[in-house]
């Protein structure tokens, strides 16, 4: 892997990659994504030659607290653009970065934004459907500044690729509207010419297929899958060094002349970065509107000032429709909001977004709407790439039941601390007639198990806009926003004065008991209205708690959590139209949860609610029976 890709990596970094040697975060740098994250030592070696890492960092490879973890992590190592390792996703994130570059070039002009995105992919990357789906979109969108090097050594962890793959990649990628160039991946002259040709193609992304040899340069293991994940023996290391012409006894060896040669282009790179700063100042001095846009897209998320629509308390509204109204309301206020739906525009309420902001493609780079097609996982990876690039607020939508398709990209949003908005509508069995394949059961709680992910399930339109505000003001936490298909009553500030401040804290008392609290009933989303009605039926003093976001509530000071859930009230119940496991941390082992721990069925939503007991009367009966 790392040895078969080394020639491409070396030529790219030494001769082509545009970056500021003194500032790895310079806005107009080229991006390089190592999709083949298991080849991390190649990237670390190149970053050492570039001066971002040092020899001590290399000696700490894969050790606790080092800047050289086993797979690259973008927030840990300067010069690492994306956290990679799960194969294929680096290609998706590179596609997202190239999309961001093309869009911002259209908005800011090429004097301010004009760079390339490179990715290095392995045989395993290319086999992952997420790479294929992203490549299809890159071709559709005409991302001419996306260049992927395919290290085709025809070996993967378990053996030769021909045991499991008969894909004709040149033909496949040509059919996806890519330029394809095939070369000897070890010939520096061919690599050089391929990159030059790729950079000249303005309307198509380029796939450079480098035919390479696994473990190229090793003494006896060239072409062997044994080298994929296992270190060389001491004897093989010694013999390989002798073959290449390196001092056999030196464990780590980097002569100063190698650094000098590698960095020979640095004066030119510094000059380019300096010239960009001059252009930037001149452009912004002469264009107040452009400066305003720049400041807005680079403002800290927590400083965003956003106004939201008002909702008619007399008209029930599905939270997905409330989301749609909120989205439409903020399009001008958040001018760098970019994203779309996985072919569910009407259902996800993104049609106005599409029509108002225009579809992004090569002919319309200023368009902000991304029609992802039925590609949930590529969508998630591309959203991460948009966020990693910077200057973009990414949003993607689909049905909650299909969050499983997108799950690992959502996990990578959380791991990389990217404030992506993952929107999921049709959040329970109330989907109705489409049946169990489209009715989420375990999905909300499955998302809640992902660290550093806020999962919002608002109870009405007003909680929805508050949840969206929180999501849009996060610096390092992505959000999963879960919305209903069915209409829900609108909770008003007059009747529920704690609502706005309460959502900020993840959970709050929506209805207080009349007197000393005898029973606590927790709920989220559509079941909040069920809980309010059941509380009226019960002949107990009931406190009803709305829990739109468990993660935010769990992070509150202990005093606030005890205030809502006093220890002396053991009669605790929760209701949610889905798997019940997450709620026991609130109700305790003596409490009960009214949930849904089985698959749904095809029938009208009202019929299913009756059959499954999701009525106020049956919830009240469940509580009474369990109090006995």
Predicted regions and their residues:
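Thiamine diphosphate
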Residues: 1-116, 264-266, 270-482, 487, ...
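Structured loop/turn residues at secondary-structure junctions
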Residues: 35, 122-123, 186, 375, ...
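Generic enzyme active-site microenvironment
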Residues: 120-121, 149, 209, 341
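Short acidic, Gly/Ser-rich segments with clustered Asp/Glu that frequently serve as metal-coordination loops
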Residues: 124-130
